[in-house]
Amino acid sequence: MLQSIIKNIWIPMKPYYTKVYQEIWIGMGLMGFIVYKIRAADKRSKALKASAPAPGHH
């Protein structure tokens, strides 16, 4: 169902989107990648803090 809707919209719009919005797609991809990297780094730092002894306990 959803795939047919995507195909019906995407196929006629594809040349327009690929030409006009190429820069936007690249920008969105980069933003998504950066956000993913930040989240991954945040998770890693939280995991390190959780595994490290709590402050005040020497």
Swiss-Prot record:
Family of this protein: Belongs to the small mitochondrial proteolipid family.
Location of the protein in the cell: Mitochondrion membrane
InterPro entries: ATP5MJ
Protein role: Subunit j, of the mitochondrial membrane ATP synthase complex (F(1)F(0) ATP synthase or Complex V) that produces ATP from ADP in the presence of a proton gradient across the membrane which is generated by electron transport complexes of the respiratory chain. ATP synthase complex consist of a soluble F(1) head domain - the catalytic core - and a membrane F(1) domain - the membrane proton channel. These two domains are linked by a central stalk rotating inside the F(1) region and a stationary peripheral stalk.
A single cellular component GO annotation: mitochondrion
GO BP annotations, alphabetical order: proton motive force-driven ATP synthesis
Membrane topology term: Single-pass membrane protein
Coiled coil feature spans: none
Transmembrane segments: 22-39
Source species of the chain: Homo sapiens
Subunit organization: Component of the ATP synthase complex composed at least of ATP5F1A/subunit alpha, ATP5F1B/subunit beta, ATP5MC1/subunit c (homooctomer), MT-ATP6/subunit a, MT-ATP8/subunit 8, ATP5ME/subunit e, ATP5MF/subunit f, ATP5MG/subunit g, ATP5MK/subunit k, ATP5MJ/subunit j, ATP5F1C/subunit gamma, ATP5F1D/subunit delta, ATP5F1E/subunit epsilon, ATP5PF/subunit F6, ATP5PB/subunit b, ATP5PD/subunit d, ATP5PO/subunit OSCP.
Superkingdom of source: Eukaryota
Protein name as it appears in the record: ATP synthase F(0) complex subunit j, mitochondrial
Keywords: Membrane, Mitochondrion, Transmembrane, Transmembrane helix
Cysteines paired by S-S bonds: none
